[in-house]
Design a protein with these regions (language model features):
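Hydrophobic/aromatic residues positioned on beta-strands within the core alpha/beta folds
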Residues: 81-82
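Active-site residues of response regulator receiver
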Residues: 8, 52
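Short hydrophobic/Thr-rich beta-strand motif most characteristic of the beta2 strand and flanking loop
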Residues: 25-32, 40
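C-terminal output helix
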Residues: 102-115
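Receiver (REC) domain active-site loop signature in two-component systems and cognate sites
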Residues: 55
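Acidic catalytic/metal-coordinating carboxylates
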Residues: 32-36, 59-63
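Charged docking surfaces used in two-component/phosphorelay signaling
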Residues: 15-23
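Active-site beta3 strand of CheY-like receiver
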Residues: 44-50
Length: 116
């Protein structure tokens, strides 16, 4: 079973995506900001990270940079989501970008494409 870490500061998004992903056979962990996500990744490496871009404490961009700086974590696939029309491109080749609002069907398709 593939483990997905969903990172978003909106509780409703965390709850809905967790429930839907679990119904599709995924194990799901959640975090409300990049700093909490980084702790979870270091304690239990997920198969894929799905992260919002703009969050308090540590943004999704900062999370992506921190993961890329760690040689043991840099190959974790990441789906970085944002309502903004332009997200600064990260040097990590394992990042896919998604525009919010992101439908669950599109999320599932992206997960499958990224090996989830």
């Amino acid at each position: 079973m593939k483990t997905i870490l969903v990172v978003d500061d909106e509780f409703d998004i965390l709850t809905v995506w967790r429930l839907l992903l679990e119904r599709h056979g995924y194990a799901v962990r959640t975090a409300s900001n990049g700093a909490a996500a980084l702790e979870l990744v270091r304690s239990s490496r997920p198969g894929i990270v799905v992260s919002d871009c703009m969050m308090p404490v540590m943004s999704g961009l900062q999370l992506c940079a921190a993961l890329y700086e760690d040689p043991e974590l840099r190959d974790i696939p990441i789906i970085l989501c944002s309502a903004a029309s332009d997200i600064p491109v990260q040097p990590n080749p394992h990042i896919a970008y998604a525009r919010k609002p992101l439908s669950f069907d599109r999320l599932l398709a992206m997960l499958v494409r990224m090996g989830g």
